Amino acid sequence: MVKRHKNTIGVWRLGKTLGTGSTSCVRLAKHAKTGDLAAIKIIPIRYASIGMEILMMRLLRHPNILRLYDVWTDHQHMYLALEYVPDGELFHYIRKHGPLSEREAAHYLSQILDAVAHCHRFRFRHRDLKLENILIKVNEQQIKIADFGMATVEPNDSCLENYCGSLHYLAPEIVSHKPYRGAPADVWSCGVILYSLLSNKLPFGGQNTDVIYNKIRHGAYDLPSSISSAAQDLLHRMLDVNPSTRITIPEVFSHPFLMGCTSLSSMDSTTPPTPSLSIDEIDPLVVDCMCVLWKKSSSKKVVRRLQQRDDNDEKYVYKVLSEILRDDMLKKQRFDENKYLSLYDLIHDNNLFTKASISTTSLVKSNVSTNSRKSSNFEDELARRVSSPLSALNQMSQSPIPIRVSSDKDYDSYACHEVVSNPSTLDDDYNYMFVCPPEEYTYSTDNVRTDSLDLQSLPTPTLEQLESVPFNRYGYVRIFPSTTLSSTASGYYTPDSLSTPEPSIDGLTNLDDVQVGGFVQGSGNQNRRPISFPVISNMQPNITNVRSASAPLCSSPVPSRRYSQYATNARYTPRKVSSGSVLRKISSFFRKD
């Protein structure tokens, strides 16, 4: 039997707090049966719309990419069970130990680039690579790339126009607000990371943001005299202001700096060429998933690429995706099919990729299901979803209610929600959930109906039953693998921070953190690490926040994913701050010209 208490999220028992950000916190957790450790990232639902992030982390199986174990939710928070890396961020490691030797820096850089290349072969662009988003296992000398919150899928025939990232790691084309390709931008960020590993400071610093922007645009930085000529040459090529002439990841692996310092001389040593496939060997199910994942790709083009003798991304992704789907289907057989959301189902979730407007909304009433079914489109869509494993929660409830939290007060009380008349046209910038909690767990209002699921009428279900049933007695719902999430297709705003002008890593001071209403504030010396600057107009910036420096860089037509209650606004007006401050310079940069 599994003893459960209020500090249990599904099959995970919560422990100490590992870290706190502007909108989330991370707690250590232990699996109730196996004893395995995990880091539970807790995000309020009003800030969480992370379907694309979950999809990427399920697809990207790589030794240098952080693993996603599990996802749970209740009516207040999302709980992501991630791989636990006890030694923490690479940022803290460099801050503690100072500059690394060239051999050690090359060893870690090769792991970072190998993981980034793995992402790029899926056409995923991370767009927020930095020391704070890289975790390290010191004893194993292994790194893990984390936080795919700003990652996106980049079609081959188009550029990205969503400008986001961390100030000191931004590529010149992003700072200049030009349409850009994600792969060269990631290479630039890796160049900044290499510079930091070798010198214990960031290459682009200054007294204000204007100075930093100008240095980035012109590629103006000072190279430490202590590093070798091979390292200097690689830095010059990675920090090339022209993305078309910037070195690529395969070229980096062939560079003398990496070849002389590591045994990994090329990407071919870790990703051997994939043989061509005949038309009889090609699985149309896998090809279909590739076309949906890559949006504009045609099946004929993918099949032609799979039949070529030369190695290409299509052959690589086909091989990896077919293995994942096969393993996923084996797992699905151990679960009730109606309660397991396979990777195939997640890829084919229309809400994950489709952007459309909501046609009709109304307040939730006790008879909302009957009223909603007056729409034939809604009834047809509901019948389709009930016959599909896409929404396990729908099948378990007599009348599922797709809702969206419309404001903070509504989020707190669930007194007012909006009903979607046609789920097939859900805007993926909203955070939709299907409300059907078990009967022993009720909300504080009568407007939301409860479901009759009772965990097989057992007062203390076993762990196996907990893993196959998405509810537990405290109202937590397992959504991975159980039901689906909505997300944006081209990245989103994050409430993390922009960087302060201080370029030094070694000179950062410790901060005595005090937990105040879910936000971290300093009670001691002013922290010189990157600060938070939320761009939502009614959010208060926290100048002593110790989380990483991620933020959008301008008004963007893509609404917020984490700030889903503001998603109806096409653009954001930054909050005005005092004249002459760094925050005002940042806010002026956000304004559209």
UniProtKB/Swiss-Prot annotation:
InterPro entries found in the cross-reference section: Kinase-like_dom_sf, Prot_kinase_dom, Protein_kinase_ATP_BS, Ser/Thr_kinase_AS
Database matches in SUPFAM superfamilies: Protein kinase-like (PK-like)
Source organism, top-level taxon: Eukaryota
Gene Ontology BP term (one): positive regulation of G2/M transition of mitotic cell cycle
Binding site for ATP: L18, G19, T20, G21, S22, T23, S24, C25, V26, K41
UniProt GO MF annotations: ATP binding; protein kinase activity; protein serine kinase activity; protein serine/threonine kinase activity; protein serine/threonine/tyrosine kinase activity
Active-site residues, Swiss-Prot/TrEMBL: D128 (proton acceptor)
Catalytic activity as recorded in UniProt: L-seryl-[protein] + ATP = O-phospho-L-seryl-[protein] + ADP + H(+); L-threonyl-[protein] + ATP = O-phospho-L-threonyl-[protein] + ADP + H(+)
Keywords for this protein: ATP-binding, Cell cycle, Cell division, Kinase, Mitosis, Nucleotide-binding, Phosphoprotein, Serine/threonine-protein kinase, Transferase
Residue ranges of every copy of the Protein kinase domain listed in the record: 12-258
Gene Ontology cellular-component annotations: Cdr2 medial cortical node complex; cell division site; cytoplasm; cytosol; medial cortical node; nucleus
CDD domains: STKc_BRSK1_2
Modified residues (Phosphoserine): S550
EC nos: 2.7.11.1
Enzyme class: transferase
Function: This protein, a dose-dependent mitotic inducer, appears to function as a negative regulator of mitosis inhibitor wee1 by phosphorylating and inactivating it.
Quaternary structure annotation from Swiss-Prot or TrEMBL: Interacts with msp1.
Family: Belongs to the protein kinase superfamily. CAMK Ser/Thr protein kinase family. NIM1 subfamily.
Protein name, UniProt field: Mitosis inducer protein kinase cdr1
